[in-house]
């Protein structure tokens, strides 16, 4: 669910913050099109991911606000004949309020598309991060060395370790 997803983003953001603090002054090459372009800091580089994931979190929160309305009492689309205080029931169930229009309540699924979009954006940002982990762990870059716990051996080269978790997540 959206709340759980935000929790995972919070954990990831905390890790990114720690990395930024630890590497605030550490210089690294900045790249454009996989070519060295200009110097930057590791903190600045991770700051880009921080901004991406903050926007992702914000999108989830915005979507939650729009989804937190109760359709109870909307019926098939024209409401119900039962004497129901929809606002009171909505509040008791923890919703912000009852939906305004019963037809819209039961016939539109835009909230699903919005939530899937949020998840797609998060996936894209995670994929980008995982791709960098793979690159940075490669022999060509050599910026990081992942623990054997997060690596698997190569089928063809016995001395090479692959960042399999990152590849699968990507």
What kind of feature is each model-predicted range?
Residues 1-38, 99-111:
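Long, non-coiled-coil amphipathic alpha-helical linker/lever segments
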């Amino acid at each position: 669910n959206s709340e759980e997803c935000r929790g995972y983003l919070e954990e990831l953001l905390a890790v990114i913050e720690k990395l930024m603090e630890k590497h605030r002054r550490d210089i690294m090459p900045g790249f454009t099109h996989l070519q060295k372009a200009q110097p930057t800091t590791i903190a600045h580089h991770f700051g880009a991911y921080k901004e991406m994931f903050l926007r992702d979190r914000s999108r989830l929160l915005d979507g939650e606000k729009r989804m937190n309305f109760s359709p109870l009492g909307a019926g098939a689309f024209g409401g119900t004949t039962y004497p129901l205080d929809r606002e009171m029931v909505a509040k008791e169930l923890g919703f912000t309020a009852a939906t305004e229009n019963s037809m819209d309540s039961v016939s539109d699924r835009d909230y699903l598309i919005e939530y899937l979009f949020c998840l797609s954006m998060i996936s894209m940002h995670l994929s980008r991060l995982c791709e960098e982990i793979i690159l940075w762990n490669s022999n060509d870059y050599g910026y990081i060395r992942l623990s054997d716990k997060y690596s698997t051996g190569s089928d063809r080269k016995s001395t090479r370790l692959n960042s399999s978790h990152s590849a699968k997540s990507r």
